[in-house]
From Swiss-Prot:
Keywords: Cell membrane, Glutathionylation, Ion transport, Lipoprotein, Membrane, Palmitate, Phosphoprotein, Potassium, Potassium transport, Signal, Sodium, Sodium transport, Sodium/potassium transport, Transmembrane, Transmembrane helix, Transport. Residues 57-92 are cytoplasmic. Belongs to the FXYD family. GO terms for cellular component: apical plasma membrane; caveola; intercalated disc; sarcolemma; sodium:potassium-exchanging ATPase complex; T-tubule. The chain crosses the membrane at residues 36-56. This is Phospholemman. The modification Phosphothreonine is found at T79, T89. It comes from the Eukaryota.
């Protein structure tokens, strides 16, 4: 019975060493999602406040509706404006 007892102790010893935590290597695919979430919320909050400040400052105007003035009005612009005036006076 002694050899069976030794084999049983040897098997239990192997199992404990196999299940013991080995030194873990750094896994490059393990991320800290809590700090990533907090950082994202901080950046989103800063961008939101910056957007509100830009809208309230009224410095950002629509550029597509403003034309560069060269000094002389375009001929087409003058005829277009006059045609609009003519149409608006007819409706009254």
């Amino acid at each position: 019975m002694a050899p069976l007892h030794h084999i049983l102790v040897l098997c239990v010893g192997f199992l404990t060493t196999a299940t013991a935590e080995a030194p873990q290597e750094h896994d490059p695919f393990t991320y800290d999602y809590q700090s990533l979430r907090i950082g994202g919320l901080i950046i989103a909050g800063i961008l939101f406040i910056l957007g509100i400040l830009i809208v309230l400052s009224r410095r950002c105007r629509c550029k597509f509706n403003q034309q560069q003035r060269t000094g002389e009005p375009d001929e087409e612009e003058g005829t277009f404006r006059s045609s609009i005036r003519r149409l608006s006076t007819r409706r009254r």
